[in-house]
């Protein structure tokens, strides 16, 4: 298993590299959003474009833009 912490990589650098890329954002509630990452701030507030909301693996809604409060975010995957 690779030890990621040995790289000493700042997560904000990773987040700035993936602006404009398709991402998956999972919330603490289990809801998943997929869309194009537009911005992330210091509080992990996230703005997505062309976003889709999934619950239990099923598409619930499609949004043009979605704004997600950072304290609800479990993880961001690119």
UniProtKB/Swiss-Prot annotation:
GO cellular component: Lsm1-7-Pat1 complex; nucleolus; P-body; sno(s)RNA-containing ribonucleoprotein complex; spliceosomal complex; U4/U6 x U5 tri-snRNP complex; U6 snRNP
Entry annotated with the keyword Acetylation: no
First-listed, main subcellular location of the protein, grouped into a coarse class: cytoplasm
Keywords: Cytoplasm, mRNA processing, mRNA splicing, Nucleus, Ribonucleoprotein, RNA-binding, rRNA processing, Spliceosome, tRNA processing
SUPFAM superfamilies named among the record's database cross-references: Sm-like ribonucleoproteins
Gene Ontology molecular function: RNA binding
Subcellular location: Cytoplasm; Nucleus
GO biological process, one term: maturation of SSU-rRNA
Pfam families for the chain: LSM
Matches recorded under InterPro entries: Lsm6/sSmF, LSM_dom_sf, Sm, Sm_dom_euk/arc
Superkingdom per UniProt: Eukaryota
Residue ranges constituting the Sm domain according to the UniProt record: 10-78
Family named by the database record: Belongs to the snRNP Sm proteins family. SmF/LSm6 subfamily.
Task performed by this protein: Component of LSm protein complexes, which are involved in RNA processing and may function in a chaperone-like manner, facilitating the efficient association of RNA processing factors with their substrates. Component of the cytoplasmic LSM1-LSM7 complex, which is thought to be involved in mRNA degradation by activating the decapping step in the 5'-to-3' mRNA decay pathway. Component of the nuclear LSM2-LSM8 complex, which is involved in splicing of nuclear mRNAs.
Subunit note: Component of the heptameric LSM1-LSM7 complex, which consists of lsm1, lsm2, lsm3, lsm4, lsm5, lsm6 and lsm7. Component of the heptameric LSM2-LSM8 complex, which consists of lsm2, lsm3, lsm4, lsm5, lsm6, lsm7 and lsm8. The LSm subunits form a seven-membered ring structure with a doughnut shape.
Protein name listed in UniProt: U6 snRNA-associated Sm-like protein LSm6
Organism (species): Aspergillus clavatus (strain ATCC 1007 / CBS 513.65 / DSM 816 / NCTC 3887 / NRRL 1 / QM 1276 / 107)
Phylogenetic placement of the source organism: Eukaryota, Fungi, Dikarya, Ascomycota, Pezizomycotina
Gene (name only): lsm6
